[in-house]
Regions:
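Hydrophobic, secondary-structure "cap" segments at the distal end of domains
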Residues: 146-156
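Conserved CoA-thioester-binding segment of acyl-CoA-metabolizing enzymes
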Residues: 1-54, 90
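Key positions in alpha-helical "signaling/recognition" and NTPase switch elements
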Residues: 115-116, 173, 249
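Glycine- (often His-adjacent) and acidic-residue-rich active-site loop
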Residues: 53-90, 107, 221
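Glycine-rich beta-to-alpha active-site loop
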Residues: 88-137, 167
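Well-ordered beta-strand positions
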Residues: 120-121, 160, 164-166, 172, ...
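C-terminal long alpha-helix characteristic of the crotonase
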Residues: 19, 123-129, 179-227, 234-235, ...
Length: 259
């Protein structure tokens, strides 16, 4: 299964499970992720969620090999993938249970960055890296990152990250408020598990109410802004520049965008 879910001791352990593809997101993974989040929502035993990625990287974003294989059907596939990613990230925010995410390696693209931004607490390994990259391949940010990233780091930092596409270190991510804390790589799993266990021991209703109050107090509803983001991504997904950007990634070359 591309996503694994196990609930015990009040903690729902949700794991992206495509390590051979750096947990790159395709429609199958995104559908399964959304279904898993809905299962967590329906299970009162899940008081806290611990989100992780199997292997060296948390999530490398979209699965570019799958995208290339779609050929002329790529725009439709990207629209479908974006829709499922939007559903998954929105469902994480809407969960009553707080979401703790542990990041190792790369959290990239709308998938990786979107999941980080939809989490409540994020623990990063010291060597972790964060990267958007959408503009570099002729696309707009997705996964809710145009909404939630701005809420987390502010307008100026969000524009810098999304327009200039820097690769942020874990320490840089901590300084701007993208992650909650940074720990040594070999302590990441244990620390994230401990944090989740500590939260699971607290009153579930108080955790849920606090999460709801914070997320609902950040201005225009996430749902409204996600809808606008999805529309923009859909418009760009079939453009020549978007297709050229993807081909350039596959062929490991500099893209030749139209001017």
């Amino acid at each position: 299964m591309p996503v694994a879910l196990e609930i015990s001791d009040g903690v729902a352990r949700l794991r992206l499970n495509r390590p051979e593809a750096s947990n790159g997101m395709n429609v199958e993974l995104l559908k399964t992720l959304h279904e898993a989040v809905l299962a967590i929502h329906a299970d009162p035993a899940a008081r806290v969620v611990l989100l992780t990625g199997e292997g060296r990287n948390f999530c490398a974003g979209g699965d570019v090999k799958t995208f290339e294989a779609k050929g002329e059907k790529l725009p439709d596939y990207l629209r479908e993938a974006t829709a499922w990613l939007q559903l998954a990230t929105a469902a994480l925010i809407q969960l009553k249970a707080p979401v703790v995410t542990a990041v190792q390696g790369f959290a990239a693209g709308g998938g990786g960055l979107g999941l980080v931004c939809s989490s409540d607490l994020v623990v990063a390994g010291r060597s972790a890296k964060f990267f958007s990259g959408a503009v570099r391949v002729g696309m707009a940010p997705d996964g809710g990152s145009s909404v939630t990233l701005t809420q987390l780091v502010g307008l100026r930092q969000a524009l810098r990250i999304l327009l200039t596409n820097p690769t942020l270190t874990a320490e840089e991510a901590l300084q701007i408020g993208l992650v909650t804390e940074v720990v040594d790589d070999d302590e990441l799993t244990e620390h994230a598990e401990s944090l989740a266990a500590d939260l699971a021991a607290l009153p579930a209703d108080a955790l849920s109410a606090t999460k709801r109050l914070v997320w609902s107090g950040v201005g225009q509803s996430v749902e409204q802004r996600l809808a606008e983001e999805a529309r923009t991504v859909s418009e760009l997904s079939g453009t020549p520049d978007a297709l050229e950007g993807l081909r350039a990634v596959i062929e490991r070359r500099v893209p030749r965008f139209s001017r």
